[in-house]
Amino acid sequence: MAVNILTLPAPAKLNLFLHIIGRRSDGYHNLQTVFQFLDYADTLKFYTAADDKFDLIDHDSHIPRDENLVWKALTALRKTYEEKGITQLPGCSIELIKRLPQGAGLGGGSSNAATALVGLNQLWGSHLNSTELQAIGRKLGADVPVFIHGHACFAEGIGDVFTNITPPTPWYLVVKPNVSISTAALFSHPKLERNCSPVTADNWQQQKVANVFEPVVCDLHTEVAMLRRALLEYAPTRLTGSGACLFSTFETRQAAKEAQQQVPKELCSFIAQGQNRSPLIQTLTQ
């Protein structure tokens, strides 16, 4: 019988702001953003498996296994271990329990991949350090490294050069409009600001920062614009990532709860507190 040997969270993240400060020679954009984690997460459960086989149990996703980021993470980590000459790896089964909405700007898939890499590396003897795991994660998705890094940070480059910071940890009301965001449409939109003035890890809180995708998403999706206006009646509100989620900032959970009661019931919403140490890292160091 399979035995649960490790259970780890795959937390959400917020982009407290997001600027594009130019285009790189490789076609990517240079970004500046602040990542902060939430105490709201998917869960990965790791089980022993007979015959050294590997499996993924995903109850909620219609994504084929070979396209699932958890499976891609497992495959990539096995390959890296084998390149190091470590081939006798114990089999395991990973159960993915989803809680985070998809297509939300919360980094759910990337967080799943990061937790898979960190968890499997621990189960297999911790032969890779954080920098090596981040290098694997970078090939899976631009947001994977920050979840492995595990601390709130001011991020630059393509979002993978980190300076640790300790911003306030308020309560957030996070709401997902019922829209599907095309990232390609956002990057090609004429209203997208691509040359923001740079800020720094020390002064970003004193600057007029924003999410450059927010006006574009609101222009393309009136539902987002209307929800944003409604939430602004209660608290400062901003888009996270490229959307579709909006987050409103409150000093207390009660204030966030009162605002949540006004959110239409057909929309996905939740309340969470900001975390400067990732819940994944907190769990591993308990």
UniProtKB/Swiss-Prot annotation:
It is an enzyme of class 2 (transferase). Coiled coil: none annotated. HAMAP family: IspE. Catalyzes the phosphorylation of the position 2 hydroxy group of 4-diphosphocytidyl-2C-methyl-D-erythritol. It comes from Idiomarina loihiensis (strain ATCC BAA-735 / DSM 15497 / L2-TR). It catalyses: 4-CDP-2-C-methyl-D-erythritol + ATP = 4-CDP-2-C-methyl-D-erythritol 2-phosphate + ADP + H(+). GO terms for biological process: isopentenyl diphosphate biosynthetic process, methylerythritol 4-phosphate pathway; terpenoid biosynthetic process. The active site is at residues 13, 143. Its EC number is 2.7.1.148. The keyword ATP-binding applies. InterPro entries: GHMP_kinase_C_dom (IPR013750), GHMP_kinase_C_sf (IPR036554), GHMP_kinase_N_dom (IPR006204), IspE (IPR004424), Ribosomal_Su5_D2-typ_SF (IPR020568), Ribsml_uS5_D2-typ_fold_subgr (IPR014721). ATP binds at residues 101-111. GO terms for molecular function: 4-(cytidine 5'-diphospho)-2-C-methyl-D-erythritol kinase activity; ATP binding. Belongs to the GHMP kinase family. IspE subfamily. This is 4-diphosphocytidyl-2-C-methyl-D-erythritol kinase. Keywords: ATP-binding, Isoprene biosynthesis, Kinase, Nucleotide-binding, Transferase. Pathway: Isoprenoid biosynthesis; isopentenyl diphosphate biosynthesis via DXP pathway; isopentenyl diphosphate from 1-deoxy-D-xylulose 5-phosphate: step 3/6. The keyword Kinase applies.
